[in-house]
Regions:
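Short, flexible helix/strand-to-coil boundary loops that buttress conserved ligand/catalytic motifs
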Residues: 35, 57-58, 86
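Structural microenvironment flanking redox-active thiols in thiol-disulfide oxidoreductases
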Residues: 1-41, 52-53
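Short low-complexity, flexible loop/linker segments enriched in glycine and/or proline
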Residues: 36-38, 60, 102-105
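Short, positively charged
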Residues: 47-59, 110-115
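Structural micro-motif
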Residues: 40-44, 60-74
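A structural signal for well-ordered alpha-helical scaffolds and beta->alpha junctions
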Residues: 46-47, 102
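Thiol-/selenol-based redox modules, centered on thioredoxin-like
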Residues: 67-115
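Solvent-exposed coil/turn segments that connect beta secondary-structure elements
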Residues: 26, 49-50, 78-79
């Protein structure tokens, strides 16, 4: 969840004006204590316990051995279409990075939105 904390607080990312939503297989009851302890206040935490969102955005193609998605970022445009998607835990990423530097995410999102 440190990624969410940093996205919420980084002024460079916030200047892009892109809302962030964190979606996890974990229930809200499982997510809430850590989110509260980390001070996550401006990023909605959603549960995808039935995998409907993961299936809709086809992120299960990068699922880890347990069947859970890895660490996927999806930028959805105003029309609901995927403008950019990147999974940082995919099998083709040997480092299976679970934290992506905010500067990298800011750069990729900036490119995708043309800023």
């Amino acid at each position: 969840m440190q990624q969410v904390v940093d996205l919420q607080s980084d002024s460079g990312f916030q200047a892009l004006g892109v809302p962030v939503v964190s979606i996890s297989f974990d229930s809200l009851d499982e997510q809430a204590p850590e989110a509260q302890a980390l001070g996550i206040t401006s990023v909605p935490m959603l549960s995808d316990s039935d995998h409907a969102v993961s299936q809709a955005y086809d992120v299960l193609q990068w699922a880890i051995a347990s069947g859970e998605p890895g660490h996927t970022f999806i930028l959805v445009d105003a029309d609901g279409r995927i403008a950019w998607i990147q999974d940082y835990g995919a099998p083709d990423n040997p480092a299976r990075t679970m934290y992506v530097p905010i500067e990298e995410l800011t750069r990729k999102v900036r490119q995708a939105i043309g800023k």
